[in-house]
Amino acid sequence: MNRTRRLRLVLCALLCVLLCSCQTVLPANEKAQVEELLRAPKLSGDYGALQTALNDWLGESAQLKYPIQGELLSPFVLQDLDGDGQQDAAVLYTTAQTANVCIAILQRDDAGSWQVRQSVEGLAETVENVSLAQLQDTDSCQLVVGYTAAQNDHYLAVYSYQDGTLSTILEQQYEQYLVENITGGSSQDLILMSTQEDGSVQIELLTADREGSFRHVAVNGLSADKFSGCASVAA
């Protein structure tokens, strides 16, 4: 089997996973009630220390934003993001002055206390899901965040934290995404699925270089009238 056909078969299998995945989203009123309940309590341990450090840096109490689905359901992501061997922290939050979700990056100082290094504004007011990925051929780890806007539009952002700076290396509208090693390299790839205006389904396979620039490895488009399942992708 040649490389092109193998790649198309892999994309076919991934499309089946994406299309058949079941998502459970809380109604807006229930989600608001949950977040309001989670706003007030003081947390303990590292989470409490992170919350205090963020509030001190902001000069007000942040409202923590919980992803509504996925494997990572906490507003706190503890991970060595820049590959320096030290644990970093990303915190999802909003304030009275911000419409969209913000992401704060914190690191420990020499005394072991958490300190905010940077904060960036996200793409929408709701965090749909969060995942960690190794999309670059480095020791660093990227933060992949899916957002949902009020109009139910979905936006994906990939963040890279290097040399003390959090950079957005990808922003794109999407419906489903998957992180997987498809090309067989030393890093993972990003698969995006979206529906076009004419109803056709587009699948994009992207891979990143060491500098964080993404390039398209493959793009498959399936017309609405011809799409009949995975066989139409592999044909």
Located regions from the model:
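N-terminal hydrophobic targeting signals that begin at the initiator methionine
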Residues: 1-2
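Sec-dependent N-terminal signal peptides of Gram-positive bacterial secreted proteins and lipoproteins
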Residues: 5-26
